[in-house]
Amino acid sequence: MRFIYACDIHGDTNKYERLFQKAKEENIEYIVLGGDLLPKRGIRVIIQPEFIKGFLNEYFKKLNDNNIKCILIPGNDDLEKLDIQINELCNRYTNIYNIDNKRVDIENVSFIGLSKVLDHPFGSKNRVLVEENLKMQPQLSEDIYINKDTAIITIEEWEKYRQTNVDKMEDILSNLPKADKEKKTIYVFHNPPYGVGLDVCANGLQVGSKAIMKFLEDSNSYMSLHGHIHESTRISGLWYNELGKTICIQPGQTELGEGKCYYVIIDTELNKQYRYEM
């Protein structure tokens, strides 16, 4: 199986188009998108539903017309309350698979996805989790948005709220669909694991999940695909590493409007992966 993997497109239509053209040029049947599909600029409650209904619908149709399948998860910047709309769109097409908290078996591969991320400094607490011994980072916004971005609380209220009202990464991972032992398992987790160079912020802070790190170490899975920290590859110099027998990949991404798009082409038969920019 050969596929293109990219993440953190954030509604950049030029990047979407480049990935489509690359799949056509290379005769690749699959595109895997690792979260943060929708625009994050402006008023997201208005822009993101319009993007799903308009561009994303037409994009999925174009992929279908060209016999290209797309496997995807949302990310923390994609409003959780729009999951119903995303699922309805994906269900219109037989070539589109939303694997958030689900498993899909394609050819000799089982894909299992998770959109959730650890609590971060940003005010929009969309899809965030905590884990054992995770300290709250200094917050960049005085207003904290919870309950799918509809309720606003203070930083002090959030500090108390997250202690009892936010799920733990360990629990979410333990309840994921089980892998098919007869197939190669690829996890698509928006949050990268801790400590293997795929989670490094511009300030050098490692913000990956220790629970995901342990999960992958114990899983004996074939591969895991990540995103979330756009600049990590630039800061650490690493876009892949290994945890036990699991190959972990984080291609990184440029910001909206910047010229380049980072992606990886993966061949599960030849056990090879190559990172590109275009």
Protein language model features and the residues they cover:
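Core catalytic region of metal-dependent phosphoesterases/phosphodiesterases
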Residues: T13-I106, P251
